[in-house]
Amino acid sequence: MKKSIVLALLLSTMVWALPTGIENAIAKSHIPQNDISIYIKEAGKRGHVIAALHENKMRTPASVIKVLTIYAAILKLGFDYRWSTRFYTTGKIKHGVLYGDLVVKGYGDPTLSDEDLPGIVSRIKAAGIGSIHGNIVIDRSYFKVGSRNTSGFDNHPHSPYNAMPDAMMFNERVSTICVVPNQNSVTKKVPDSSYVVHNQLQRVNRPCRGRYSWPRVKIDDSKAVPEVWLKGKISKHCGKRNICQVLTKPYKSFYYALRAALENAGVPVTGTLRLRQVPKGANILFTHYSDPLENIVSVTAKKSNNLYARHLLLLLGAKMYGAPATIEKGRRAVRVILKARGVLKHVIPHIDNGCGLSRESRLTARVLADVLDDAYERYGMRWMKILSIAGVDGTIKRRFRGTIVRNRAWMKTGTLKHAKNIAGYVKSRNGRYYTVVILVNTRRGNWRAAALENDIIKWMVTYRGGSSHISTPKSVSDSSKKINTNTVTPHVSTDTAKEAYYIQTGSFSQKPTGFYLRTLREMGFTYSVIHDVNYKVLVGPYATETEARNTLGTIRKHVNRGAFLTRHSVSVFN
């Protein structure tokens, strides 16, 4: 009983067996270890683990959950999948006149925009339609998402990142108001009568900065037709200002934009907007396709596009379990797809909406690393290039610009209040690839978390492992002080070996107790205790990696599951 209490007290003060560089980064950050999950290993399913800290603890993932959504979509649909939007007609076309309705069925293409309208109108005209004596009917039944928004999440329901999904998406649900003060102009970028703009701006002869550089925007969406009020004083020296907000329903915006494009092309429409499913007997006119999925998921990852991720989740639900798509179907689809790949062995994550804009999503570093490893082995660089490239593009373009990490990391980031996460791959200077997952859920400040992540990733670039397939922390410097070595016969001759393999079983802020060391002796292990930043217990030496790895499993089972292989000069211990 006494031994159990002593061991429990010892383990309570024990620091997980982490490489010195990572230990130092954590200490520098002043973030409690309980707030941090780390899982770093050689890339690939059989890669050796380098660092593990709370890797099985559920965390708020924020946008790194998109990795699961994106990978499941690629597995199910393929890189070349394209979203469709189908155009039908009812009635007949006589002498260039459609006596019937133009019917549009949306299947959730999140990229459909006003830039697609010229091509769509051209194909309508090419079908022999010069005017439409009927309505424009929109079928948005492929998604069953209701009208709930995320205003309860952060009280910014009109911000583009909060845009909710719709099967008839248009311009990512964002309405753009163009303000040009030096021309005294306020216009809608795309014709849209589903909302009203009231211009109450006062132009003043002041420098374009501070409170004179941008309009005050007030939105009233309590009415059937939302109203936008532009208020305040703005410098007449300011250039164009684009106000981009979620103001109205995307299917309404699509209707007004399509109708305006048709009429501008000389195709008048006599009817109005109708919402219903495609009538039986409707004739297919043509199908408009999105860009390939590979392009879309790249934007989803690099720009962390929440709307795209939501649509991917819903699409998977419909493809797996039939229309209409629902969030629950989508969640189940992602779980089933990833389970089939064997990457949800340890714990089932809670995916929620697929984009990470949620306080209910939960994920472990280990599961995320498993997904990244599977994707790495299956698709290699094609997959990696979907993620943000350090110092080059996406959410880590500025973060690692001008650092040693530039062009050496492919990452997905995730940020919410009290959550700062990053996951992906790092290429070290010696050409090896590592899977890196760092999840920090803390109240100590996201800036501290970002700095910690940056330090660890920079350290990984300089990290040197052993021979092929060996993952080890930095070598202990020759100045490390030997504290104690037991008297069991060594496994390798110190006369002939310059370096040998060791198993680091623990790292302590205080010198480990005799009870802990006696446990190792009673198990028949050779060990050494060295001191640099912490007191580290190393079992070994072993002449080959195979010998060391055979022992590693036993130590992880009976001593410390965070134990790992390392490699040192034998002279350090003599």
Where are these regions (language model features)?
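Sec-dependent N-terminal signal peptides
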Residues: 4-13
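Beta-lactamase-like hydrolase cores
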Residues: 17-45, 49-58, 118-127
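Conserved serine DD-peptidase/penicillin-binding transpeptidase domain
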Residues: 20-26, 76-345, 463-483
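Soluble periplasmic/extracytoplasmic beta-strand elements of cell-envelope proteins
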Residues: 37-41, 101-105, 135-139, 167-169, ...
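Small-residue-rich helix-loop
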Residues: 49-52, 303, 313-478, 483, ...
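Short active-site loop at a secondary-structure junction
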Residues: 52-72
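Short, surface-exposed beta-strand/loop micro-motifs that present aromatic residues
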Residues: 92, 213-221, 420-428, 528-529
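Extracytoplasmic
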Residues: 200-210, 340, 466-499, 508-574
